[in-house]
């Protein structure tokens, strides 16, 4: 028992350090590319000329594609293990291919730092899980390998999103398939250790998103949250179907990986000429929506262009996650509904923010089929725990409908 406690804490601390180092590497590339280190790719896009804005994501995609293509071409052996930590936990034995995972993470660093509309957290979690896998193979029994990889993945997610409980439930709901208490203990300890280490590295304790404090929802607001869950239940499968169609369309072109990723990048670059907000994973745009939401038409325009950029990035094979982009799409859809609902003052002056947070949780639940994780994650990322009952209700509704329409989640389809 003591041994597991010590290992869990150690994995949490190292995972947080890995996430922090990856973020520092992103800031370094941002300084090289844009001479700025504020971490906002949207601000970087707005500060450069149009031709650079159009070409930078394409060049990043080309560089990442060349790296992946060269590795595949000159690697004279088949991968000894997967590079997907979910596969390693669910159907594997906990082993990850070290060299392939490192190359994939480096390629992800290149595309996310150059503006592709893909999540950076995927590589962060992969690297944390990779360290846990290497450690487990050296110091743990084979039957424990999957547990320690799960701890690394949960810790990486907790550090990236400042959400230790949601990171733990992510593993429990999606990978273990149930809340297995015997396995959940070390996972929670690793996740909490990761968050504490992250707070030390960042010099403070803050939620990922800063929002105004919301009161407990009224009965009519509970109804609207449930209604948004219903909408997300239909929107989630459509989003996944669109990503699958985009991937099929890119594959049908039969391009070499460098050219395919460059094509995805140029699409993102051209869309950024209309709205610079399409650059990056969507974090800064979500923060802006939650604090100073624009009008309905502007939100709709950004949403359409950002959605196309996400489809181009993921469809072209850009290595990265779709977790944060999904949060953006959900926030934008929710804010659109909230802006419309705000025409009726009786619904409250905070209805826009409430709907945006509900949209984030429900679309995440509809795509991951993990309602408890999605509801708790939004609460942890914002500190708005008074919304938890309503978010749980709406997320369960969203997940139920999404499962009925499309039994395969975003992680099963990848």
Swiss-Prot record:
Q: What is the effect of changing residue 134 to I?
A: In strain: 487/90
> Where does this protein have coiled-coil stretches?
none
Protein purpose: Probably acts as an electrical shunt for an outwardly-directed proton pump that is linked to amino acid decarboxylation, as part of the extreme acid resistance (XAR) response.
**Top-level taxonomy:** Bacteria, Pseudomonadati, Pseudomonadota, Gammaproteobacteria, Enterobacterales
Q: How does it sit in the membrane?
A: Multi-pass membrane protein
Name of the coding gene: clcB
Q: GO CC annotations?
A: chloride channel complex; plasma membrane
Query: What family does the Swiss-Prot or TrEMBL record give for this protein?
Result: Belongs to the chloride channel (TC 2.A.49) family. ClcB subfamily.
Q: Which organism is it from?
A: Yersinia pseudotuberculosis serotype I (strain IP32953)
Effect of changing residue 66 to S: reported as: In strain: 487/90
The entry's protein name is Voltage-gated ClC-type chloride channel ClcB
Query: For this protein, what is any one GO molecular function term?
Result: voltage-gated chloride channel activity
């Amino acid at each position: 028992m003591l041994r597991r406690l010590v290992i869990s804490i150690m994995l949490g601390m190292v995972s947080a350090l890995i996430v922090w180092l990856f973020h520092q590497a992103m800031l370094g590339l941002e300084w090289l590319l844009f001479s700025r280190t504020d971490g906002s790719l949207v601000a970087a896009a707005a500060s450069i000329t149009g031709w650079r804005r159009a070409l930078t994501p394409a060049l990043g995609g080309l560089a990442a594609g060349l790296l992946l293509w060269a590795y595949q071409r000159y690697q004279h052996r088949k991968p000894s293990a997967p590079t997907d930590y979910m596969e390693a936990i669910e159907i594997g034995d906990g082993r990850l291919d070290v060299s392939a995972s490192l190359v994939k993470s480096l390629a992800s660093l290149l595309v996310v730092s150059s503006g592709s509309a893909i999540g950076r957290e995927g590589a962060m979690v992969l690297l944390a899980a990779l360290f846990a896998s290497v450690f487990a193979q050296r110091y743990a029994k084979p039957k424990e390998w999957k547990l320690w990889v799960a701890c690394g993945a949960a810790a990486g997610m907790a550090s990236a999103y400042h959400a230790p409980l949601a990171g733990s439930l992510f593993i429990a709901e999606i990978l273990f398939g149930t809340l297995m208490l015997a396995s959940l203990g070390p996972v929670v300890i690793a996740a909490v250790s990761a968050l504490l280490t992250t707070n030390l590295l960042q010099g403070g304790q803050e939620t990922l998103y800063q929002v105004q404090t919301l009161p407990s929802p009224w009965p009519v607001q509970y109804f609207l949250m449930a209604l948004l869950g219903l909408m997300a239940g239909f929107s989630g499968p459509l989003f996944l179907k669109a990503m699958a169609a985009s991937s099929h369309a890119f594959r049908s072109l039969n391009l070499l990986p460098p050219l395919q990723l460059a094509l995805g990048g140029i699409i993102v670059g051209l869309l950024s000429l209309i709205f610079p907000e399409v650059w990056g994973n969507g974090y800064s745009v979500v923060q802006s929506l939650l604090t100073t939401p624009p009008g309905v038409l502007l939100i709709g325009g950004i949403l359409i262009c950002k959605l196309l950029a996400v489809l181009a990035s993921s469809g072209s094979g850009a290595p990265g996650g779709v977790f944060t982009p999904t949060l953006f799409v959900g926030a934008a859809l929710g804010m659109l509904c909230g802006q419309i609902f705000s025409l009726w003052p009786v619904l409250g002056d905070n209805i826009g923010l409430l709907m945006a947070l509900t949209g984030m949780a429900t679309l995440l639940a509809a795509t991951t089929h993990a309602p408890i994780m999605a509801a708790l994650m939004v609460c942890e990322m914002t500190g708005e725990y008074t919304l938890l009952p309503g978010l749980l209700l709406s997320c369960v509704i969203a997940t139920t409908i999404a499962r009925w329409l499309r039994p395969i989640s975003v992680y099963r389809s990848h």
